[in-house]
Structures are given as structure tokens and as C-alpha cells.
């Protein structure tokens, strides 16, 4: 890639700054960490790796980066693409081979959504591998739009106010998941991916499933964004500014103990005696 234009330079700086802020705000990476960067071959994970490699150079702490891709034995998967790219970068990498494709195709009826099972199988394999190589953090490429979409998916279909946290301790207690792109927009990531011309690998298993619930939510948010630019960012800020007393979860706030405070000073003016 040659010299960047002014706008391209701003884009790169913005992504690096936002990722750096997310890493700092949630203490995602610490001195001596071994960060396993999970690469799918998509725009998000390529951008995450690119940004983390820059952060590794400029951060005041020392940490390792190990790139890991999982070959799920999907038909037509271009096995050579990621190794060639990572060799050119000169970083440590591993290709984990696990035939989850056959498992998914066997268990999920034709035409049904495969994403949930595929994701669980992939995540479990990666958790195990992170433990094997002694990785202290596992970096995933989810961005701000993913987090907001997940929030609405859980609210609409599961009846829960839950999203994707920027940092998460896995249920097994042995893996800490981080999402360095949590503050970054998908629009910026797509533009950066186009700029860098990353060798994108499409998902042949689920990439064509347009009837996904997530796709419906994504289109809803995109329509909102067209009508009111900045709405997705505002919703994300809301996830960082939760006020339990203004919700209805009795586990988060003790509503039963609310009583009138007779010693409190009245806030209202007695207009009758004015």
C-alpha cells in the first residue's frame, strides 16, 4: 500500500485510537500477555490483527501475538491464503484443523441456520487450543455494530438485556476473551479492509443465509442509521451508561425497600402561598 490520502490516514488513526482506548478502558492486554488473535479470514479479524500489531509496537508494555485460524474443513476452503499472508507478516501462527463442517451439516437440517452451532463448536475448539499454547487472552474481531446487534437480538428473541462484553471470562474460568474493536464501527472496518486489500475468505457454510435473525436486526439498525446518523453509536453509549433504578430487574436494584424519606427537603414550590 502506497502513501495514504488525508482521509485514509484519518481512518487508520481513528481505528488505532479507538482500539487503543478500548484496550485501555477494559484493561484487555497486560504486561507479558500472550494474545491469541483468532483469524477467520474476514475483514474484522484482519483489521484486528493489523491494529494489534501496531499497538504492540507503540504500547508501553510488552506482549506476544499469536495468530490462529481454524480450518473447519468446509468445501473449497482456500488453505493457502492465511498461511501465505501470515508468513509475509512474519508472525507466529497456527492453523487448527477440526472438521466441524461435517458435524454441523449432520445435525442441522438443510435450510436452517447453522451459525449458532458452528460458533459454539469453533469457540470450544479455540478455547482448548488457547489453553494448550498458554495464551492468556483470546482476541475476537467483534466490533461496535456486532455488540449493538447482539443487544437487540437478545432483547427481541430472548427477553434479556445482554450484549457482547468487550472483555469476558469464559465459563471454564481458563480463558479471557477480549474484543479490541469494541469501539470501532463496521463501516470504518470495511473501508479499512478495502484500503488494505486483505485476502478475504468467504464463509461457504453460512455466508449465504440471508434469513438469519441477525441480518434482520442489522438491516433495522442500518435503516435507523440512514434516517438518524449516529444512532448506533448512541445506543452503544447507552450500554455503557446503565441505570438499574430506571429498569425493572429486581436483582439489580432493591425496589422493595423504597420508602418516602420524611426528612427530605421538598422539591416543589408551594404556588398557593406565592
From Swiss-Prot:
Organism the protein comes from: Pseudomonas fluorescens (strain ATCC BAA-477 / NRRL B-23932 / Pf-5)
Subunit (UniProt): Homodimer.
Co-factor binding comment: Binds 1 [4Fe-4S] cluster per subunit. The cluster is chelated by three Cys residues, the fourth Fe has a free coordination site that may bind a sulfur atom transferred from the persulfide of IscS.
Listed InterPro entries: Rossmann-like_a/b/a_fold, TilS/TtcA_N, tRNA_Cyd_32_2_STrfase, tRNA_thiolation_TtcA_Ctu1
UniProt-annotated location(s): Cytoplasm
Pathway: tRNA modification
Protein name: tRNA-cytidine(32) 2-sulfurtransferase
Signal peptide start-end: none
An annotated GO cellular component: cytoplasm
Gene Ontology molecular functions: 4 iron, 4 sulfur cluster binding; ATP binding; magnesium ion binding; sulfurtransferase activity; tRNA binding
Function per UniProt: Catalyzes the ATP-dependent 2-thiolation of cytidine in position 32 of tRNA, to form 2-thiocytidine (s(2)C32). The sulfur atoms are provided by the cysteine/cysteine desulfurase (IscS) system.
Keywords (A to Z) from UniProt: 4Fe-4S, ATP-binding, Cytoplasm, Iron, Iron-sulfur, Magnesium, Metal-binding, Nucleotide-binding, RNA-binding, Transferase, tRNA processing, tRNA-binding
CDD domains in UniProt: TtcA-like (cd24138)
Amino acid at each position: 500500500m502506497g502513501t495514504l490520502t488525508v482521509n485514509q490516514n484519518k481512518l487508520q488513526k481513528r481505528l488505532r485510537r479507538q482500539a487503543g482506548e478500548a484496550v485501555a478502558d477494559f484493561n484487555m492486554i497486560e504486561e507479558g500477555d500472550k494474545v491469541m488473535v483468532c483469524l477467520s479470514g474476514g475483514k474484522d479479524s484482519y483489521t484486528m490483527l493489523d491494529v494489534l500489531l501496531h499497538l504492540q509496537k507503540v504500547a508501553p508494555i510488552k506482549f506476544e501475538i499469536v495468530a490462529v485460524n481454524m480450518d473447519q474443513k468446509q468445501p473449497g476452503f482456500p488453505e493457502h491464503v492465511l498461511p501465505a499472508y501470515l508468513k509475509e507478516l512474519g508472525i507466529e501462527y497456527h492453523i487448527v484443523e477440526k472438521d466441524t463442517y461435517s458435524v454441523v451439516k449432520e445435525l442441522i437440517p438443510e435450510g436452517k441456520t447453522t451459525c449458532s452451532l458452528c460458533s459454539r463448536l469453533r469457540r470450544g475448539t479455540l478455547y482448548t487450543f488457547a489453553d494448550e499454547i498458554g495464551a492468556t487472552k483470546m482476541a475476537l474481531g467483534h466490533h461496535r455494530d456486532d455488540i449493538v446487534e447482539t443487544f437487540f437480538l437478545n432483547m427481541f428473541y430472548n427477553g434479556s438485556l445482554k450484549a457482547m462484553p468487550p472483555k469476558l471470562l469464559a465459563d471454564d474460568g481458563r480463558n479471557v476473551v477480549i474484543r479490541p474493536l469494541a469501539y470501532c464501527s463496521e463501516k470504518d472496518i470495511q473501508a479499512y479492509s478495502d484500503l488494505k486489500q486483505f485476502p478475504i475468505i468467504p464463509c461457504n457454510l453460512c455466508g449465504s443465509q440471508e434469513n438469519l435473525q441477525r441480518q434482520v436486526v442489522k438491516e433495522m439498525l442500518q435503516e435507523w442509521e440512514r434516517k438518524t446518523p449516529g444512532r448506533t453509536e448512541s445506543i452503544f453509549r447507552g450500554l455503557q451508561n446503565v441505570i438499574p433504578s430506571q429498569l425493572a430487574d429486581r436483582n439489580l436494584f432493591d425496589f422493595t425497600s423504597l420508602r418516602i424519606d420524611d426528612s427530605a427537603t421538598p422539591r416543589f414550590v408551594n404556588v398557593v402561598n406565592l
